[in-house]
A protein has these predicted regions:
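Membrane-interface extramembranous regions
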Residues: 2-162
Length: 162
């Protein structure tokens, strides 16, 4: 364990490592949310269900976009710019996951856009699981990034008098 920590850059702290792990797990989770919606759209023929089919397709596309951004090396643009992009992508992913989760739970008890789910088949269980994992992992990532930025000293732009 000590050798792994020694291999990390000196400024890397355990919370930063936890943040990166949460980021990558969250990225995989939101991509899996998209995969479930794509399978349901194409394989289970939800494409023919008005409104719901369109929402499944949008969830698939949106999940793919934010998941890809979360996996991309955007911190090469600079630490602050990279963190901003990653936090915005994480918040987008959380929005997709929470929206999907809420919609699924509502449609279990009452019609949503004229459609009502019944029972907990595998696709529903997987969607619930991946929505929850996305929310937890990326919520943790956002909190860690916010905490790390709050702990940094402010950047000053004052020029020294010559």
């Amino acid at each position: 364990m000590a050798s792994v920590l020694q291999a990390l850059p000196a400024r890397t702290r355990p919370t930063e490592v936890a943040g990166e792990v949460a980021r990558y797990f969250g990225a995989v989770s939101i991509l899996l949310v998209g995969a479930v919606h794509a399978q349901q759209y194409y394989g289970a023929y939800f494409s023919v269900v008005p409104t719901i089919g369109t929402l499944f397709l949008l969830s698939f596309v949106g999940s793919g976009v934010v998941g890809t951004v979360l996996l991309a090396p955007v911190r090469r643009l600079g630490r602050n710019a990279g963190d901003l992009i990653l936090v915005l992508a994480a918040l987008g992913a959380i929005g997709i996951a929470v929206g999907s989760l809420a919609s699924l739970l509502v449609s279990e008890y009452m019609p949503l856009f004229g459609f009502m789910e019944s029972g907990y088949r595998l696709a529903i269980v997987l969607a619930l699981l991946f929505d929850a994992l996305t929310t937890v992992f990326l919520g943790l990532f956002v909190l860690i990034v916010a905490r790390n930025h709050a702990a940094q000293p402010p950047i000053t732009t004052e020029r020294k008098a010559r």
